[in-house]
């Protein structure tokens, strides 16, 4: 929260994954986008809290990869609710900007599977059409299980997603963006190594690759 507050005067839009729904009141004036992670998307309190947001919110598919669970989460967040939040009875009107985020999946044996390919996106388009959801949209998380945490693969995956937008009008209409993990220095480090600008969690693209990839995305949107 301190980092978010200190950057509030900048022109950079800020996004955060919401781990704890009860903390929303502390950061709601600082964020322009909220993601609900794969391990939280099935939690009812996360779904209900998002229904009261006035910013775009992305629901990631669960680690199982189940599209129906993900879309049911979007359905819940897009509709109004009465529920107890931080000790108060509250009413929400629903968040029409709730959408899905595809982040790949993990099998019961621990193997990763991808869900950014053409056939996955077409299947998602069809499932969206079958449900009573407004503003059907998807963001593709190109790291996590989609890359198997091989962070350099993000570059290739982004190009594939952008190509699929070019060859299918349905995919182009639905896929609004990609989610990339990047930082100043590429890769990651263990806590205590103290390399400035290097991730201590998931491995990330470095500054140069991130910059070049943004230019590639811009070119492929033309």
Model-derived regions, located:
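Catalytic-face loop-and-helix region of soluble metabolic enzyme cores
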Residues: 105, 109, 133, 139-200, ...
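General beta-strand structural signal in soluble alpha/beta enzymes
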Residues: 14-18, 57-61, 180
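Acidic, His- and aromatic-enriched active-site or binding-groove loops in soluble protein domains
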Residues: 7, 31-57, 79-83
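Conserved mixed alpha/beta catalytic, RNA-binding, or beta-rich assembly cores of soluble enzyme
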Residues: 52, 59, 64-159, 163
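Catalytic-site microenvironment of enzymes
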Residues: 11, 27, 126, 130, ...
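Solvent-exposed alpha-helices and their adjacent loops that cap or buttress functional pockets
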Residues: 6, 50-51, 90-94, 170-172
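N-terminal active-site wall of soluble small-molecule enzyme domains
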Residues: 10, 18-26
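Single conserved hydrophobic/aromatic residue that forms the stacking wall/gate
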Residues: 1-9, 13
